[in-house]
């Protein structure tokens, strides 16, 4: 992939605040550093809840949410963007992968006191057809055990489990809480201890 970069070179001499890559810095209402000028989408930054900073993550989810907020605010409302976790997913052949929050590399670059755990499990019970391996990685605060990020990979059900992790990170859940989280169980869909429960329980 060639990657994405903001097409904002025409703003170079306007004085508008931008990141080094040209992304327009905005606040939680979509306002730029120039009064009455708003921005949203792949040209603008988003606030990352874990990094606690304005970052460039050009995703359709972020663009749509901020577009709605900017539109509402231009119409006289006072709506605020609650922040992103950079949740994303991909399908390659028969494999799917999802990520949310920060990666272990991010944690290192941020000089966080963190721990990580990696587990291999199955997506559901062995007596139902379609059982596949599933892999979960968690990054969490070493002191508080608050979950900071995670990735899930497998042939089936990886992305939806990533959505659960996104909810857990947004709610500032700990690994202990994830380990005991009451998730749905039926033999075709999960095991009595879901892979996410297991990942939480081994994160000490």
Can you name each region flagged by the protein language model?
Residues 29-30, 89, 128:
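Short secondary-structure boundary/capping segments
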Residues 95-100, 109-204:
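Flexible, glycine-rich terminal cap/loop adjacent to redox cofactors
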Residues 17-21, 77-88, 113, 117:
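A short alpha-helix-loop-beta-strand transition element characteristic
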Residues 21, 85, 102, 133-135:
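Short beta-strand-initiation
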Residues 2-4, 42-43, 88, 93-94, ...:
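Glycine-rich beta-alpha junction loops
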Residues 1-69, 164, 168-171:
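FAD-site-proximal beta/loop scaffold in flavoenzymes
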Residues 26, 40-103, 188-204:
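A conserved FAD-binding loop/helix module that cradles the flavin
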């Amino acid at each position: 992939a060639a990657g994405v970069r903001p097409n904002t070179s025409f703003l170079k001499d306007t004085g508008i605040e931008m990141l080094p890559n040209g992304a327009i810095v905005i606040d939680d209402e979509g306002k730029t550093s120039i009064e009455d000028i708003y921005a949203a989408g792949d040209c603008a930054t988003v606030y990352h809840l874990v990094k606690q900073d304005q970052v460039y993550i050009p995703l359709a989810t972020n663009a749509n949410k901020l577009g709605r907020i900017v539109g509402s605010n231009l119409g006289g409302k006072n709506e605020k963007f609650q922040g992103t976790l950079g949740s994303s997913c991909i399908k390659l052949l028969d494999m799917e992968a999802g990520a949310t929050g920060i990666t272990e590399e991010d944690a290192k670059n941020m000089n966080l006191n963190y721990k990580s755990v990696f587990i291999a499990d199955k997506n559901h019970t062995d007596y139902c057809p379609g059982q596949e391996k599933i892999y979960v990685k968690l990054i969490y605060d070493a002191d508080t055990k608050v979950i900071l990020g995670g990735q899930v990979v497998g042939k089936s059900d990886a992305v939806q489990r990533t959505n659960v992790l996104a909810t857990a990170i947004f709610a500032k859940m700990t690994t202990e809480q994830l380990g005991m989280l009451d998730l749905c169980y039926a033999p075709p869909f999960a095991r009595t201890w879901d892979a996410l429960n297991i990942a939480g329980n081994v994160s000490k």
